[in-house]
Amino acid sequence: MGYFKQLCTTEDHPRKGLLPVEWVMMTYLLATLLFIFANWSRLPHTGLMLSVRGQALLVTLALWLLYRMKPCRLTILLRIAGQMALLGLWYPDTYELNRVFPNLDHIFASWEESLFGCQTALVFNQVCHWPWFSELVTMGYVSYYPLFVGVSVFYFIWRYEQFERATFIILTSFFLSYVIFIFLPVAGPQFYFKAVGVENIAAGIYPNLQYYFSQLEFDVLNPIFSLPLPGYADGFFHHVLEFTHNAGERPTAAFPSSHVSVTVVAMFLAWESRNRWLFWLFLPFAVLLFFGTFYIQAHYAIDAIAGLVSGAIFYYVLGRVYKA
C-alpha cells in the first residue's frame, strides 16, 4: 500500500515538456516524415506510414496530458511504456521506408560464407536438430522483450533515480537501429534464401535481388515469402515464436541484429545496476538469444556479431549523451 502511494504521490517539480526519449521519438518521426515526402512517388503505402506517425503523436500527447493532470511516478512509467509499445509500429515501418533502396542480402550472404565457410543459418539448425536444443535457443530468442522490459522494470522499482536514463539508452538504441535498417536493407536468411532458392544457397550462389522485396505486397502469413520456421514444431517456445513472427515480421532489419544489440545494452544496464542477481539471471537468456538469431534463420551470424559491437557502442555513447 505504501509503495502504491509513493507511485501516485504528486511530484514537487513536474516537468512541463517532453522526456528525453520522447524527444528522440519526435526527432525520428520528423526525420522519417521528411524522408517520406522526399520519396513520395516511390513509396507504395504512404497513407499507412502517415497513420503510424499520427498514432505515435496521439499516444505521446495523450500520455503527456495524463502526466500533466497527475505528475507522478506512475504517469512517468506510462509515458515510457507508451514509447515501448509504439516500437511495434516503428519496426515494420522500416520495411516501408527502405523500399527505395536495393536489397543487399547477396553481399552479406557472401561475407557469411567467406568468414565461416558455410551459411550458419542453413547449417546450424540441421546439425543441432534435437528438440531440447531447439526449444532452448528459441526460448532465448523470444526472451528478447522480457529482457529489456525486465531491466526497465527493475530500474523503475529499485533504481528509480536512473530509470529515465536506462530507458533512454534502451529506446534510443532501437531508433538508431531503425535508422541503420532504413539505409541498409538486409532481409535476412528466412526471406532471402526463400526468394533465391535454398539449392542456390547450398551451391554458394547468391543472386542480387535488386528491388525484389521492395516490389512485394508482402504478407507474413503467406508461406511463399519465407522459409518455414526451423526447430521443434510442437514445442511451446516454437509456438510463441510463430505468434511473434506472424504479428509483424518483415523482410527487413537483419544487420546488425537489434535483438542482440538491445540485449547487450540491457545486460550492460543490468550490470550497472549493481544487482548481480539480475545480471546472472538474464545472462543465460542473452547467450541463447545470440545463437537463436541465426538458428531460427532470422539473421546471418555476422548480424549477431555486429549486434554485439553496435550494442556496446550504443550503451557507451548514449550513456554519455544523456549525461550531457
Model region roles, listed by residue range:
Residues 29-37, 86-91, 174-182, 286-295:
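Aromatic-anchored segments of alpha-helical transmembrane domains
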Residues 54-59, 140-151, 254-266:
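Hydrophobic alpha-helical transmembrane segments
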Residues 231-324:
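Membrane-embedded catalytic cores of phosphoryl/pyrophosphoryl-handling enzymes
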Residues 77-81, 149-184, 190-207:
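Interfacial segments of alpha-helical transmembrane regions
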Residues 183-272:
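Membrane-interfacial catalytic/cofactor-binding modules of polytopic membrane enzymes
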Residues 2-55, 74-148, 186:
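N-terminal transmembrane-helix/juxtamembrane module of multi-pass inner/ER membrane proteins
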Residues 62-72, 153-161, 270-274, 316-321:
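Structural signal for the C-terminal ends of transmembrane alpha-helices
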Residues 55-63, 84-88, 174, 288-289, ...:
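Alpha-helical transmembrane segments and their membrane-interface exit regions
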